[in-house]
Amino acid sequence: MAYAALASARLGHRSAAIFGADKIAAGAAEIDLLRSAGVEVHIVPLEQGPIFENVEKDHGRVQTCIEPGEPVPVVDVPNVWRAAPAWLVVPVSNETGPEWAAAIPPDARLVLGWQGLLRKLVAGTETGRKAPTRGPLVDRADLIGVSRGDLGKGTGLDELNKLLRPGTRLVLTDGIHGGLAFEATTRGPANEVTYDSIPSRQVDSTGAGDVFLAALVAAWLDRGAPTEEPGPTSADLRWAAAAGALAVEGVGLPGVPDRAAVIARLADIDHEGQKRHGSDCSRSEDRPDRH
């Protein structure tokens, strides 16, 4: 949740965050960083929060569950928070139970990061993977984000579509291969939009998916898109991909980019594309005509 909340704030949106935290986590420097960025923080006291150990290896990240933590109960929040146009639910250890689906105001967009509901967690063992299933949060969600790496091999769009209520949009990310978005319908996936990845120099991938999702919501809100729109658009996805690419180039929460950084990265990419196009045209014009 911390990455999504900070990304929302740094991308220019008023942001509030509800955290379940034990005494140690509640006093962490990351909480101060959120507050300094303008995020309004509500900490729900827990006896034990989740703890993971991440180790990057040649074949990818290996994550070990040190402590799975405990559920975060639904809490009362200020009325101004309840008026927010979008709520991001991004659990890390299945800590947001089904009761959270009913707690989100009915006229707000519910955006779900599916990853945290798909982890099989046993203290002292490597994090496992659960098959995606339906549930109150999935049924309530207007937009769901998930990585191919969080799904079993061979999980196809038709299979995912069957788990979603008609009208829900799902974004399926695939790292350097880009990704796609589609709208769930009774006839199968519809309104599919693909996007390319943004080149990056990866240092730390922690939280990149949450930053991507928060940036996607920010783009959606910036143009006043209605909830019934079969988005997100290719421009929304490109913006989110740039934010996610920047996030992996830093270390930890301080690496979350701001709006200016995303704009600059996209401008650099456009400039490089124009240079390549111009070079290709020049080479074409230099070739002698052959008759």
Q: Model features per residue range: what roles?
A:
Residues 77, 134, 202:
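Acidic, amphipathic alpha-helical patches
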Residues 23, 120-128, 225-229:
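Short, flexible/disordered intra-domain loops and linkers
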Residues 52-53, 119-125, 202-207:
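Short, charged, surface-exposed secondary-structure boundary motifs
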Residues 6, 52-55, 178-182:
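Short beta-strand scaffold segments in enzyme catalytic cores
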Residues 157-291:
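Conserved phosphate-binding/catalytic region of the ribokinase-like
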Residues 1-10:
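Histidine-anchored nucleotide/phosphate-binding helix
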Residues 10-95, 100-112, 265-281, 287-291:
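Conserved N-terminal subdomain of the carbohydrate kinase-like
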Residues 86-161, 176-178, 184-185:
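Conserved beta-alpha-beta core of the PfkB/ribokinase-like small-molecule kinase fold
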